[in-house]
Amino acid sequence: MNGLGGLNKSPEGVVIGLVQLQLPNVVTRADLARQTERIVWMVGKARRNLSTMDLVVFPEYSLHGLSMDTNPEIMCRLDGPEVTAFKKACVDNRIWGCFSIMEFNPHGNPYNSGLIIDDHGEIKLYYRKLHPWIPVEPWEPGDIGIPVIEGPKGARIALIICHDGMFPEMARECAYKGAEIMIRTAGYTAPIREAWRFTNQANSFQNLMVTANVCMCGSDGSFDSMGEGMIVNFDGAVLAHGTTGRADEIITAEVRPDLVREARINWGVENNIYQLWHRGYVAVKGGAMDCPYTFMQDMVAGTFRLPWEDQVKVTDGSSCGFPAPTRMYGKTAKAAE
């Protein structure tokens, strides 16, 4: 059930549009300005495409492309012209929007950040990618956790970025904090296609949570991104899937946060996020409420260590042309000098 891509919208439905944006090549400030205009135009296209659409989602790297360029001249700020333009586009088109920026960081490497802006032009969600795609990406690891907001129709929404979604703990954190819809934006290329598909479905099923996932699309002359917009229902069933690889196509579906809430309350079999803390409640009252997972205990204690830790060969970005870092997490670049 997806309401024919949102054409037939139910009273409780939220219609999401995933933009499989053509992969750009952004090097200069002028390139950045042109790509900003392109995204603004696509917000308008989304509204013209489907009058029922509540939220339009742009992929990771939609503004900067896949070059991994950390040049401060093309990094964004929350009060900069790019974000200002996105805010205006949401107001002008009466639509919520999810956008990607590479954000200037005066204390270290840039952040890979995501924003959700409402139809009044207000930033409602601001997230910094927790898990950069190492060793390929140079971005500073995020430091503000995973926010969950109230979006269109009161839907509880979270945002994660690309590689984040390969960690089941990320989707679990979103759901634990109440998210009914988890957005996953990405710049992934074709070698990740199958992992992209099954993790999107697993993230939904394991948490009784809708996921809306989209990559960049097309080629910039060096890289080929795959599109693969996927909207997955809370039971893991795919509601909509962009399989043609057609750049600038908008994949749409209606999702039902009210049915997510209903399932979380009423499901017995496979209500996994509840049962995680209530193991074996048939045998013991309330189930076992403990933490039998060694890795969780060790992370909290700061002693997480793999049995093969000392054998791991790739532990910095030097294989991808980045200098080995000397600064520890939590220390500013200036303090490390």
Curated annotation (Swiss-Prot):
GO molecular function: formamidase activity; N-carbamoylputrescine amidase activity
Domain CN hydrolase: 14-257
EC number(s) recorded for this UniProt protein: 3.5.1.49
Keywords for the protein's UniProt record, in alphabetical order: Hydrolase
Described function: Is an aliphatic amidase with a restricted substrate specificity, as it only hydrolyzes formamide.
NCBIfam families for the chain: PRK13287.1 (NF009803)
Protein name: Formamidase
The gene coding this protein: amiF
